[in-house]
Structures are given as structure tokens and as C-alpha cells.
Amino acid sequence: MLKFILIFSFSIIVTTAKAQTGKLPCSNPVYRQFDFWIGEWEAFGPDGKKAGDSKISVILDSCIIFEEWTSASLQQGLRYAGKSFNTYNAATKQWQQTWVDNVGGTNEYMQGKFQNNQIIYTSTPFKFTKDSMAIRKMTFTNISPVKLRQHGEISMDKGISWSTEYDLEYRRKK
């Protein structure tokens, strides 16, 4: 019952705040920093081969940038696919991403910032092997209205040095 009361009270507060301001909660311009990613894209690796397709849309009253990824090729008989939820957290003033995929994988990037036409995400340390920890960094660079770069890196030494896990060039579909 307490849970119901809290949820009901929160919905009244949000509805009242929206009615008083006439704006949606995520209408602040900071929520639009990642809009350069919105659209339908083909992604290519450094070798020029197509890596996959990505559809990026805005959901939940413009609060979430939602990614739907599908690989171009089969891997062990499976077409790899995943989804991510990206949002700006006003409390921490950080961008955040949660990724889930069809092989049971997840990644969480709880720290992200917008600077120099880029969104740069960093994960919290996670167990990489039985005896080692790692950190992931993922950078989205807005190159032009029809092209962007997604660069994934990993560090095994607490962020001192980084190795590329993937490097993708996104080309907007026509």
C-alpha cells in the first residue's frame, strides 16, 4: 500500500509540475545534446565492411534515446542484436547508458559527458576475468549530419591506458 501511495504521489507531483510549467520534464536543452545520433544508420568497421544497422529514436516523452542494433552477419548461427537506453541524469549531471543484448550481455555506463561535439561514456569497474577488473569507455563523435563515429575502448589498468574494442563509422541511411 505504501508503494502505491508513493507512486500515486509522485505522479501527481510530476503532473502538477508539467501543468504549472507547460513543459515536459526532459525539455531542457541538455537532454538534446545527443540528438545527433537520432535516425537510421548503417555502421561500418575500419576495414569498410558493414558491421550492422542501428535505429535510434526518442521515447518516453523525449527523456530516453533508444537504440536498436542488429549485426550485419551471423556469428555462430546467431544474428547479434541489442538495445540501449540513454538518458541525461539531471541529479548527477551525467549521461547514462544501459545496454542489453540477445546473448545475455549487459553494459552500464553511469558516467557520461558532452564535450567538443562528443558524448563520452565511462563504465564503473567490472570483473573482466576471474582475476582482473576492467573499465570501458565509449565515445560518440558527431562528424557531420550524415556521419558519426562510435569508438569502444577497454582499460585493464584503471584507465591509465586504453585498447580499442571496436571502431565504427555510422552513415545515415537515405
What are these regions (language model features)?
Residues 1-23:
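Bacterial Sec-dependent N-terminal signal peptides
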